[in-house]
């Protein structure tokens, strides 16, 4: 029996505040003005993409005590941008990254339920945790949460928010003008939740939204992150976009679903990838080389080098070999607020690996940094890129890709104009949206509302928590 042909899922990531974005390119626009977000989202919708994805950083990055300003600095609030985009798009899903460490479930649930209403059922939440006290200082929290507790809090945070989403069935609002009755159930929105992190009870004030809950994304790659995704997420944002790494990650995460009573098609694996398209493969390779040089300037190469070596290397030649001195090991780092620092736990071992690679391939410091810090990219003619993406999806290396252009807001256009039609011709990508909600686009089953029995029991628990007799 032949294997069914999979449909490809595509999404667009508005580039974040990192060196993927070539903000100095003459074609690059603002990362602050709404017109850039609107143009980017409308291009993704024109291409029939599943959703737009926004990352989020809660503190400006620093290096050697100064703002890291080689990349884009600053970004408008995620919810504000997504709510505005809901008004200028009709079908495109709207995915926002919201932190579970420095927020509260009630606030986040209200915001996502509201976004789901305003967008007609297109909201999604990428649940992330924060690992450093540096970010926590913005919230007067410092390092209040040990790193090994962050997923525990994230799990209970999500569970609490889901209980709030489910506190309405969806049929309570009757708006009976003749009899002056607005809701049919006096217990609508009642909730009570108590665990090691949250102790809340009351009434949730946003009625059930079109999807019931936002689609849940997760982006962690640790063992805890993979288990969290297998237990609770609808999709996972992955960095494993090559064939071997993608297949290994795909098999691992999909293989965990059964232990949580879930089927393999209930979680989508969506790696992020950049792309460079040319009329020919050779032209695309030339363009990609120029993009890589723009992404890893001499200054950027030195900054990345300093993050691993944890010492001032401002006098180092980026076109020369790697430093002969060893990295400085310790809790005090010269780079703060950058996720890549977490990858450098064993800095001496990584430095030795880098030296071996540089020597074997005759790479300068800058060339080495561009190789090891670059994101997986699809490079080639439209035909080559379309074939590569389809081959990876059909080989179960992914269920699709979250595409990250290096220029905004117009960097998505070449893919939409030249690659999407080829995928549509091959019958592996939609020609039109078939549904209206993000769950529809992702092929996820609708979420059933909680029964009257479940809601009544929760209302009684809430009354007991507040001392109200039932």
Sequence positions of predicted segments:
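Acidic (Asp/Glu)-rich catalytic clusters
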Residues: 2-5, 45-46, 82-90, 116-122, ...
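Active-site mouth loops of central-metabolism enzymes
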Residues: 21-35, 97-106, 142-144, 148, ...
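Catalytic domains of carbohydrate-active enzymes, especially glycoside hydrolases
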Residues: 32-57, 228-238, 389-400
